[in-house]
């Protein structure tokens, strides 16, 4: 709403916020049904592959259902043909075989996701950087996607 903020202070001075019909664009996505507002995610948590929208949280939630996965983060990477491709970075639980687990996780995900949602590549990490509140810092993970 117009009461959210007056504007931004930048190196150029004071700038008005970019609004749509007087409302600030937060990047949140949701829907309005039966006088209730549902927030479903954020615009940057969605990628477009071959014209279809993919919610990265769907991939993460599917991976976290696997008994050997401790943490998971799905990211989108630009692709010349598809537009964007989903990638998955996982931390496996201790005492589990990473090479065995990565193959099993691929099978596990193919059974639970639409074919278009299956990650192009699964990357193993020893840990995922987090904020003080425990949220995964996805910006720090993009370097792992570089070939």
Predicted features, each with a name:
Residues 10-11, 137:
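Short, solvent-exposed helix-helix connector turns and helix-capping sites enriched
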Residues 135-147:
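Phosphopantetheine-dependent thiolation modules in NRPS/PKS and related acyl-activating systems
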Residues 10, 19-20, 79, 131:
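Acidic surface patches and DE-rich sequence motifs
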Residues 1, 6-7, 22, 27-117, ...:
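AMP-binding/adenylate-forming catalytic core of the ANL superfamily
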Residues 18-19, 145:
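A general structural motif at alpha-helix termini
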Residues 14-15:
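Short secondary-structure edge/capping micro-motifs at helix/strand boundaries
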């Amino acid at each position: 709403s117009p009461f959210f903020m007056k504007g931004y202070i930048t190196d150029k001075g004071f700038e008005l916020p970019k609004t749509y019909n007087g409302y600030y664009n937060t990047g949140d996505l949701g829907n309005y049904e039966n006088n209730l507002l549902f927030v479903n995610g954020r615009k940057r948590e969605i990628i477009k592959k071959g014209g279809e929208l993919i919610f990265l949280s769907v991939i993460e939630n599917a991976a976290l259902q696997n008994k050997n996965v401790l943490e998971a983060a799905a990211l989108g990477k630009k692709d010349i043909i598809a537009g964007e491709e989903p990638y998955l970075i996982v931390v496996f639980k201790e005492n589990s075989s990473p090479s065995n687990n990565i193959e099993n996780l691929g099978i596990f995900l193919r059974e639970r996701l639409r074919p278009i949602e299956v990650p192009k590549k699964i990357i193993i990490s020893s840990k995922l950087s987090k904020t003080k509140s425990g949220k995964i810092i996805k910006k720090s993970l993009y370097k792992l996607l570089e070939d």
